[in-house]
């Protein structure tokens, strides 16, 4: 493949297809999306903050290999790197990029699931970053993990996960979804709940460490620990959210206006995310996530839901009013006018009416 350009992300240089030569990134023989640089940088910060060293890291859908190479160069955590792509041209480019950066790795040209099954019980970290849904790769991904490990997934089929295509969502993720003011968080929790159920089916306990939404994708990194008792505990955090405008509540059995099944437990580790913020960029974003993770409610509210006298207040005015009323509330990264709190919609409205 001759039509390539030298690019840079973080501290690594690598070759990727020249989008000008192919018309778009989607027409190139090897997929590389520069818009996902933030995803890759946050993933590097995550693995660095995770704190382990000598890890066996597998990226079964490598493309140019830049994610895995950045793990090896920038985290100090990787002892063995395994890169794979089903495309021969991608594998050639991966090898070239490894050479450019002086990184050693095992490189395979196989179907991702075939490789993951062959790596059974051998990986500490499996990072599944597909174009579209991670669902077809999750079972094999868990089987590749050791007794304790980390699984990371990206999902770009956000329209399916939030329920814009409800039948496809039901087929692919086994969840009933419909439009709500907090549909983005519901979509992220839909993905997380699905991954947790797959983890349980492979006898792994599951703990989300870092999860977020960014424009056109959801991202999740979670700890997995093998054991039937741990796997059973996953279902303590699987439930449904009943939405009857504007109220929300967690229920264990679905009703007519219920979303789910969803992950209704914690979405991340604030301590780990604060440590990520110490290592590099996106500090404000990570601080916001850390604050969000401190609120247990599996939803957020939007200020316009509480328009008083037909007038919708700004987010800062609403947060200040809630604080004066003794209610803890934080902003969410999922909506500019959104906030998370553990009190009911009725209590939010009552306080806003009194204070504003």
UniProtKB/Swiss-Prot annotation:
It catalyses: guanosine(26) in tRNA + 2 S-adenosyl-L-methionine = N(2)-dimethylguanosine(26) in tRNA + 2 S-adenosyl-L-homocysteine + 2 H(+). Transmembrane segments: none annotated. Residues 5-352 form the Trm1 methyltransferase domain. GO terms for molecular function: tRNA (guanine(26)-N2)-dimethyltransferase activity; tRNA binding. S-adenosyl-L-methionine binds at residues 40, 67, 85, 111-112. It comes from the Archaea. It is an enzyme of class 2 (transferase). Belongs to the class I-like SAM-binding methyltransferase superfamily. Trm1 family. Dimethylates a single guanine residue at position 26 of a number of tRNAs using S-adenosyl-L-methionine as donor of the methyl groups. This is tRNA (guanine(26)-N(2))-dimethyltransferase. It comes from Pyrobaculum arsenaticum (strain DSM 13514 / JCM 11321 / PZ6). The gene is trm1.
């Amino acid at each position: 493949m001759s039509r390539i350009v030298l690019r840079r992300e973080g501290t690594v240089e690598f070759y990727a297809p020249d989008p000008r030569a192919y018309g778009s990134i989607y027409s190139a023989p090897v997929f590389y999306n520069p818009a996902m640089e933030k995803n890759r940088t946050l993933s590097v910060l995550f693995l660095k903050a995770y704190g382990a060293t000598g890890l066996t890291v597998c990226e079964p859908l490598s493309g140019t290999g830049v994610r895995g190479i950045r793990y090896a160069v920038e985290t100090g955590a990787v002892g063995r790197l395994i890169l794979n792509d089903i495309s021969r041209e991608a594998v050639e480019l991966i090898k070239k990029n490894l050479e450019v950066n002086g990184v050693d790795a095992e490189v395979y040209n196989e179907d991702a699931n075939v490789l993951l099954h062959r790596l059974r019980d051998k990986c500490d970290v499996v990072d599944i970053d597909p174009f579209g849904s991670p669902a077809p790769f999750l079972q094999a991904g868990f089987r590749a993990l050791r007794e304790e490990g980390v699984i990371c997934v990206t999902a770009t089929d956000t329209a399916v996960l939030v329920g814009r295509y409800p039948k496809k969502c039901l087929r692919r993720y086994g969840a009933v979804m419909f439009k709500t003011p907090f549909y983005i968080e519901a979509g992220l929790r839909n993905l997380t709940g699905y991954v947790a159920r797959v983890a349980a089916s492979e006898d792994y306990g599951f703990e989300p460490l870092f999860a977020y939404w960014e424009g056109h994708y959801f991202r999740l990194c979670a700890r997995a620990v093998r054991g039937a008792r741990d796997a059973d505990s996953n279902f303590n955090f699987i439930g449904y959210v009943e939405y009857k405008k504007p109220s929300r509540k967690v229920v264990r059995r679905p009703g007519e206006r219920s979303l789910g099944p969803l992950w209704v437990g914690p979405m991340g580790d604030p301590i780990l995310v604060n440590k990520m913020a110490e290592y590099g960029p996106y500090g404000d974003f990570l601080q916001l996530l850390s604050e969000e993770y401190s609120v247990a409610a599996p939803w957020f509210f939007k200020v316009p839901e509480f328009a008083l006298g037909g007038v919708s207040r700004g987010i800062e005015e609403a947060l200040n009013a809630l604080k004066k009323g003794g209610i803890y509330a934080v902003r969410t990264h999922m909506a500019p006018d959104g906030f998370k709190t553990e009190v009911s919609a009725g209590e939010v409205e009552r306080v806003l009416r009194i204070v504003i």
